[in-house]
Amino acid sequence: AGDPTLSASELGPLSSVLAADHLSEQLARAVKHGATIAGTGTQDGAWFSPVVLTDVTPENPAHAEEFFGPVAMVYRATDEAHAIEIANDTPFGLGSYVFTTDPDQALRVADQIEAGMVFINGVGLDSPELPFGGIKRSGFGRELGRFGMEEFVNRKMIRVLH
């Protein structure tokens, strides 16, 4: 609990010790294939300290994996088009984030990102009235919001010719 930018703040545990063990294995594999870890990445039971991975190449297994824990991968992009290419080079597409001071760029980039949800200039902006869901291997369909309600409705078409 607490401000995530303060070292005294504590993150809650992962869903299980097994989940934390899997995260440790993923990080070890990423480092073995050339990634660099910033942060401690230490495990204590189901607790896991935050990690930032850099130097992840497309050949690194981490590039195509989901990390269910406090892990962020940081990539360097040469320009906006390259950043979009990096963002879309994944089999997953649940949520993405765009941070910019240019509102036109924010919408232009968000429109090109292949994800079910794109949040601009903020994290944790989801809400029960907004649809939630992904594309690619991150699922299909939506839950929550009007679109989510429609996922649980059976519609029937009846056509009568006279």
Model-derived features with residue positions:
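Conserved C-terminal structural/oligomerization subdomain of aldehyde/semialdehyde dehydrogenase
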Residues: 44-162
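Flexible, acidic loop-helix segments that line cofactor/substrate-binding pockets
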Residues: 1-25, 42-48, 64-69, 128-131
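Diglycine-centered glycine-rich loop/turn motifs
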Residues: 36-41
